[in-house]
Amino acid sequence: MVATGIIRSRLPEHTRIVCHIKDPRLPAIAEAKGCTKTAAAVDLWQEDGLLDGAVIAMGNAPTALFRVLEVMRETGARPAAIVGIPVGFVGAAESKDALVADDSGVEYITVLGRRGGSAMAVAAVNAMASRAETTNDR
């Protein structure tokens, strides 16, 4: 849902928006690893070399946010920024607390507690893109 809401015209030319959630490989990967499809999608991002330098945005998947932080620790991957605003009662607050506590130095945007969601994540990404566009900092 985040990928759908991003205003592509505000992004630098040739910017890719990658969402693996509909990737047919995900169910098998998730089952083999004993994780959620969204967490498995993070592994696909890493395998495809897409984490380093990327802006990672999540609005609904605390397990994916946890996995991004794990992959960063395990591999040294370094996104440019993380917009981590998962919503919900199970793991959402904890995943955002883990993001805040992360000592990698990667910039982040979050909303502490259980509130969040795709709309907030999209708004944050679009605001960053708009700001970069108006300051020529793309």
Describe these PLM feature segments.
Residues 15-18, 53-57, 79-83, 106-110, ...:
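Structural motif
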Residues 2-5, 63-68, 89-93, 117-121:
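Short glycine/serine/threonine-rich phosphate/pyrophosphate-binding segments
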Residues 64-81, 93-94, 99-101:
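Feature captures the catalytic cores and cofactor-binding loops of soluble hydro-lyases/lyases
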Residues 9-11, 46-51, 73-77, 100-103, ...:
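Solvent-exposed alpha-helices and their adjacent loops that cap or buttress functional pockets
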Residues 83-84, 124:
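Buried hydrophobic positions in well-ordered alpha/beta secondary-structure cores of metabolic enzymes
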Residues 3-54:
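Long, charge-dense
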Residues 90-138:
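C-terminal functional extensions of proteins
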Residues 38, 58-74, 90, 124:
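Glycine-rich phosphate-binding loops that contact phosphosugars or nucleotide phosphates
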